[in-house]
Amino acid sequence: MTEAPQYTPTRADLPLSIAGPAGRIEAAFDQPDGLALPVLAIVCHPLPTEGGSMHNKVVTMTARALRECGVATLRFNFRGVGQSEGTFDDGDGELDDLRAVVGWARAEHSDKALWLGGFSFGAWVSLRAAVEVQAAALISIAPPVGRSWSFDDIPLPSVPWLVIQGDDDEIVSAGAVQDWVASLTHPPELVRMPGASHFFHRKLIDLRGAIRSGVRSWLPEA
């Protein structure tokens, strides 16, 4: 797998250290641009063993698009990534990490509805958590259907759910994602992006637009 492109942190990022089941979890909280809505979105990063982190450009663009819609965002590093303690645990420990981050968000931002989002491996982890943590909405970007991660027996949310998939994805089969979405009893909205690779090279602005358009109807009144 090609190493994920990275993002250079700016001073706008507010660093956090959250207590997690494997030790401290490195995170970054960002207020929305302009008028703030009572929503907080947690965005999960791609596979740690392939260079995935909260600084991945798809993750940061997702967070940027949401902030432009008035949504606060929280990115974090799974165990063993960056300053987060612990070691990779094939998704189960990472799910526990997300649970801990959700717990922090609920305690510190109890006035906000909780959205979950994720890219690739992060899309799988966030989907696994969505029903349990009562997420109010879900964004899944290039969910790794047909890869190493089983989508069988995952409780599926009945909340607003957006799936974005590049048609030229060299890692996740766009056809497999389309078939999976079509097989669901209550399928999410699927947006297919022509010419987009797994990491959305030269398509990040298009991704930003797809996210903004996709969540517009979910936004509460200011």
What are these regions (language model features)?
Residues 183-199:
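Catalytic histidine neighborhood in serine/cysteine hydrolases
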Residues 117-126:
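Gly/Ala-rich beta-loop-alpha elbow adjacent to hydrolase catalytic centers
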Residues 88-109:
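Alpha/beta-hydrolase active-site loop
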